[in-house]
Amino acid sequence: MNNSQGRVTFEDVTVNFTQGEWQRLNPEQRNLYRDVMLENYSNLVSVGQGETTKPDVILRLEQGKEPWLEEEEVLGSGRAEKNGDIGGQIWKPKDVKESLAREVPSINKETLTTQKGVECDGSKKILPLGIDDVSSLQHYVQNNSHDDNGYRKLVGNNPSKFVGQQLKCNACRKLFSSKSRLQSHLRRHACQKPFECHSCGRAFGEKWKLDKHQKTHAEERPYKCENCGNAYKQKSNLFQHQKMHTKEKPYQCKTCGKAFSWKSSCINHEKIHNAKKSYQCNECEKSFRQNSTLIQHKKVHTGQKPFQCTDCGKAFIYKSDLVKHQRIHTGEKPYKCSICEKAFSQKSNVIDHEKIHTGKRAYECDLCGNTFIQKKNLIQHKKIHTGEKPYECNRCGKAFFQKSNLHSHQKTHSGERTYRCSECGKTFIRKLNLSLHKKTHTGQKPYGCSECGKAFADRSYLVRHQKRIHSR
């Protein structure tokens, strides 16, 4: 077959097996077949020569099904009869490799289209686009594997050890359990990203990553939570969200007993007990266990705030802070108290709130003995003893313990009253004052005195009552 004289089709590069032939192949031979066929098909698609309807053999391979055909289908596919029977022998991986290299033409850059190279940021080498199992990627794998002599670089001296053999990347020394995973990893070193999104132009090294990314462009959110109505683009995100409602935490840390909803979270947490803080900030000398945490921390020093709210323009250092902030605009409060069902926008707030019901005051001031439900309240309280008031008004010079108090104070200068009661229209400078005011409309008085039974709308009123009346 001369590929240069005509259009390459998937039929030109397809090898079919009967059920009997397929069953004689061992797992590593089947994996090799899958790698070659999927890689060739993806290369055809990437240059616009793939079929509009995905071939049945590719569908089967992607779904993990066995791709064998009935014997008459195989004979009718144009494959030579001498290749229709493997003679009962069990092929070695090397034999399968050589046979597939003969039967499945290499789809290289000359066969498809002439493409320019790309420059790898890591090595500054110009590398060809259009990787397939037989041509440029195979060459790269062979040059970066840990053994000698061609295909044995991947499988070792004994081809039967291919399955389960740990393959090593010479560039970063990372180990892999299968050849396909090593190949996928090597694309990163080679800066090869053949799968491009037609909507935004972003490119990916693996097709499944492109498929996942393309869902972010679609407005459709097909996976909906039956409890709260939240919708998600991916089913895995819905499963993760639903654990919030069930409070299921099956994975427990063996060292401290802390429980997690996800196994990966538990594994990452356990590293805290073992790992050294080997990543140090050269600005403040603070140390971290993970390099990713150090990178995030450095943004504090640079002032970089890459995550901006599209509603109000406010920018944040961390994406998680932006997500929390956006709930102010949407009014979303996904975290409910299990006792009184009060809803909160942040998980940490509901955890702190539930401590009010238990009465647990775990944080004690070592100077005066006052106890607090929340650690942040203890930190703020200690400033009373030190006299520290780090937040100063730039208009009148008045200083405050808390930044929130400074913001509230500055509104007295501007006259801004941003919090309005929906019942009577009265406006307030502070959100706290609006919350207290609303209770006059509802008549709600949840804080009862244990001594006389008198009820109050706010906890501060109850505390003041107990000090004035019952502590005499």
Curated annotation (Swiss-Prot):
Keywords: DNA-binding, Metal-binding, Nucleus, Repeat, Transcription, Transcription regulation, Zinc, Zinc-finger. A zinc finger (C2H2-type) spans 167-189, 195-217, 223-245, 251-273, 279-301, 307-329, 335-357, 363-385, 391-413, 419-441, 447-470. One of its GO terms (biological process) is regulation of transcription by RNA polymerase II. GO terms for cellular component: nucleus. The keyword Transcription regulation applies. CDD domains: KRAB_A-box. It is found in: Nucleus. Residues 8-80 form the KRAB domain. The keyword Repeat applies. GO terms for molecular function: DNA-binding transcription factor activity, RNA polymerase II-specific; RNA polymerase II cis-regulatory region sequence-specific DNA binding; zinc ion binding. May be involved in transcriptional regulation. Belongs to the krueppel C2H2-type zinc-finger protein family. This is Zinc finger imprinted 3. It comes from Homo sapiens (Human).
